[in-house]
Amino acid sequence: MALVARRAAVPSARSSARPAFARAAPRRSVVVRAEAGAVNDDTFKNVVLESSVPVLVDFWAPWCGPCRIIAPVVDEIAGEYKDKLKCVKLNTDESPNVASEYGIRSIPTIMVFKGGKKCETIIGAVPKATIVQTVEKYLN
């Protein structure tokens, strides 16, 4: 019978404390930081309906999980389209009159307004691509 010697499991000099994927070069991407503004029952007409550019309105509530999921997406869109599109958020708990006027029954609901008129409605937490595709139809 031949005996086979085993090597002790000792880390080699080449290994490091960090896994290989962590040693890779960092990804660089440009992120435009912006936040959607806030509107309420008192400011909605002036900010949204009288806007010279299209407006994306995010109807939300602080207790709504899906609303919190899409909030950063709306903020990203606000940054990416800041010169072409106005993005605002309306808290339906604090501004029930506007929410009622536009028949908001489910949140999150996103509406796109252009020229003071409602053009499009998106209900639910949808992917960013869906929101962008909808918004781009109304940009000049």
UniProtKB/Swiss-Prot annotation:
The organism of origin for this protein: Chlamydomonas reinhardtii
Complex formation: Forms a complex with heterodimeric ferredoxin-thioredoxin reductase (FTR) and ferredoxin.
The protein's name: Thioredoxin M-type, chloroplastic
Site (Contributes to redox potential value): G65, P66
Subcellular location: Plastid, Chloroplast
Site, Deprotonates C-terminal active site Cys: residue positions: D58
InterPro entries: Thioredoxin, Thioredoxin-like_sf, Thioredoxin_CS, Thioredoxin_domain
Domain Thioredoxin: 35-140
Role description: Participates in various redox reactions through the reversible oxidation of the active center dithiol to a disulfide. The M form is known to activate NADP-malate dehydrogenase.
Family listed: Belongs to the thioredoxin family. Plant M-type subfamily.
Active site: C64 (nucleophile), C67 (nucleophile)
Transit peptide feature, positions: 1-34
Origin: domain of life: Eukaryota
Cellular-component GO terms for this entry: chloroplast
Molecular-function GO terms, alphabetical: protein-disulfide reductase activity
Keyword Methyltransferase included in the entry's annotation: no
Lineage: Eukaryota, Viridiplantae, Chlorophyta, core chlorophytes, Chlorophyceae
